């Protein structure tokens, strides 16, 4: 079938599809393209170009051909969370402001498109099995948001130095914040860090709220108890500038 341009929003969400039908194959979608919440294993028949957001969350990508055959350019956000992806092979070369790939089986970010390594972009890969942030060029990029909660990251080295909005490193086996960002424009999420031994390396500037876990703080400050929350907050405030306060739960 000859592929065509479609100047509209494609909505195939939640239709129990196992594949993208041949009869809607198109070269370009000049709106958003949404195939989330199906049972799709291959992006065959997806458009090569998407002007809006490309949304393929909550499918079975990774059990088939992964992201291969998908769009080469997405001018909006690229969302591929909730799949079975073990690699980024086939991901679009050009991606707009945000790439979200939470809840997959990624062990590395090899293949990450260089287009996401530009200032003011957002990257989210929560709930994967990434072990380090080095080698991807993150440190030279001023991200808008940077999220990697619940991975296997042991060090913040190699990550971005400046994040203009929110930064989330919660639930990783880091021992300190050394090598992490020096400035976070909004919130810094650092809860459930069971291996944390020191607050060394905390960003010097946090524009929003610093979120920490009480269990982690009592391990670092063994002379305090849960009743000393205010003292703990005061102690931590001496280490960094926090715009909206410190939350310890």
Question: Which residues are covered by each model-predicted region?
Answer:
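N-terminal capping/linker segments that flank leucine-rich repeat
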Residues: 1-23, 216-249
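Concave beta-strand-loop units of leucine-rich repeat
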Residues: 12-16, 29-40, 49-62, 74-85, ...
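Canonical leucine-rich repeat
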Residues: 20, 43-46, 63-70, 88, ...
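Intrinsically disordered, low-complexity coil segments
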Residues: 64-68, 119-120, 142, 224-230
